């Protein structure tokens, strides 16, 4: 009996003995499953025109930023490039594809992908150098010789407005040159007129002589096509009027 009682007392420490009165093992299992209430998830409806336009604008904006000159790419790749560059020499920029990925594997299809560089230097940015002071050119890495060479080119407005110099001698010299050109043109025109006049006088005499010669030829040539000139009807012939018996017949 003692052993049974001890066994029963020892068995009272099991999981079922700790349950409240009126609850069973099945109730505990159900409560464990339904500990968090089930929430019905919403079902997305069809996309509207406004949502579609916003999505398209967002995608286009991202492409525009990536294709712009101020896009530096992924910052993690730039940091890795700076950490890996142990020497102070400048290494070539990393070239990425459209998805900003560079797995290091060269493929034949890579030549059809759009490439972009990260870590662009200051020379590649379209800065307006006129807005920066000259003291910052050395820090920005701008070559002064190159800048001076570019500044030598004239602007497009100079072609129409001139060089902007207010020198009267330049205007006078231009007027003098224009007058000389006008005089040369007048002299050339008068010389050409006199030469043409002399040539026309000689030409008129030649024309008159040619006309006289042509008239004589016409008079001589008028009877060339006169058939009556070469036709003889026999009226002027004396054959058959008188017969001379002493004359022999001519064959």
UniProtKB/Swiss-Prot annotation:
GO CC annotations on file: nucleoplasm; nucleus; RNA polymerase III complex
Assembly: Component of the RNA polymerase III (Pol III) complex consisting of 17 subunits.
DNA-binding in keyword set: yes
Any single GO BP term: transcription initiation at RNA polymerase III promoter
Matches recorded under Pfam families: RNA_pol_3_Rpc31
Name of the molecule in the record: DNA-directed RNA polymerase III subunit RPC7
Entry-annotated residues carrying Phosphoserine: 189
Keywords: DNA-binding, DNA-directed RNA polymerase, Nucleotidyltransferase, Nucleus, Phosphoprotein, Transcription, Transferase
Annotated GO MF terms: DNA binding; nucleotidyltransferase activity
Family: Belongs to the eukaryotic RPC7 RNA polymerase subunit family.
Additional observations: The acidic domain is essential for its function.
Keyword Phosphoprotein: yes
